[in-house]
Amino acid sequence: MYINGHFCYAYKFGIVTNGLGIVRDITFYNKEFLKAHPDIVVEKKSDSPDEDKSLADSKALLPVLVDFFQKHPLIAPKTFLGDAAFDTIEIYKALFGEIGFEKAFIPLRVKLSMEDNGYTINENGVPCCPHDPSLPMKREGSKSHLKSKIPTMKFVCPKMKWEYNKADKTKRRVCHCDNPCTTSSCGRMIYVYPEKNLRAYPGVERGSAEWEETYKIRVNVEKSINHFKDSFCVANRKTQNEKTLHADLLLAGIAQLVTVIVADKIHQHQYIRSLKPLIA
């Protein structure tokens, strides 16, 4: 297979962690895993090795998560963080439907495409001013006020301001655009329905402050994976025996959990993923 810029023979495994990078599940992608999930079809390799790797990752994700939540029914997280390899419509539908996540922080792998509604959208799925595609509209509110109660995201004219009326002590929207795209005094309003395009609106506005702050947490996951490779010596193995590698991988996970327990007991939480400083 093709991994990180070179061809190699390798055994693949999947790790599920929490937001702290603490391992919660390890799945070895061996024959037993494929036998337990016959819906996973190993297709012929394409002309793009990188694409093959992404397809393999995306196909393994849902079976791993389904198995995990079946084993741990009391664990019910609402936020999913993953890389761009998981940017597929099928995965979004499963995450929000069958599995029950409310937000999915997954970078786009392919540019968004939307139907023509008289306005354009930017790379984050935010509608732009019909007269100026470089001017994104402003998000307003996070809950639906429509009678249908269908979840919506409301965007308003970026040149709209709330003004206070001293006479009747009320606030109203006033559009201060020199070239308005609507006759409404409060400016253009656009409602989008996330369920119609989960890639564009995965429970959170792409590019927002919430998106940027939350996705930073994924750094913990990358650090955890590096600790498995380096501190727990999973990388650069000499043996090619599958059972030995599988056992060593599980022991590495156990070692990390022991590290977490010890760090917690001695109140050194900064070392929950750092074995070497903890024993130094």
For every predicted segment, state its role.
Residues 1-84, 88-97:
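Polybasic low-complexity intrinsically disordered regions
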Residues 84, 118-154, 194-240:
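Short amphipathic alpha-helical "interface-anchor" segments enriched in bulky aromatics
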Residues 153-207:
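Long, low-complexity, polar/charged, intrinsically disordered or flexibly structured peripheral segments
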Residues 99-108:
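Short hydrophobic/aromatic-enriched beta-strand-loop microsegments
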Residues 84, 108-109:
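Active-site proximal loops enriched in glycine and acidic residues that flank catalytic Cys/His/Asp
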Residues 110-115:
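Short gly/pro/ser/thr-enriched loop/turn and capping motifs at secondary-structure boundaries
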Residues 92-93, 116-118:
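Short, well-ordered secondary-structure micro-motifs
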Residues 213-280:
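Basic, amphipathic alpha-helical segments enriched in Lys/Arg and hydrophobic/aromatic residues
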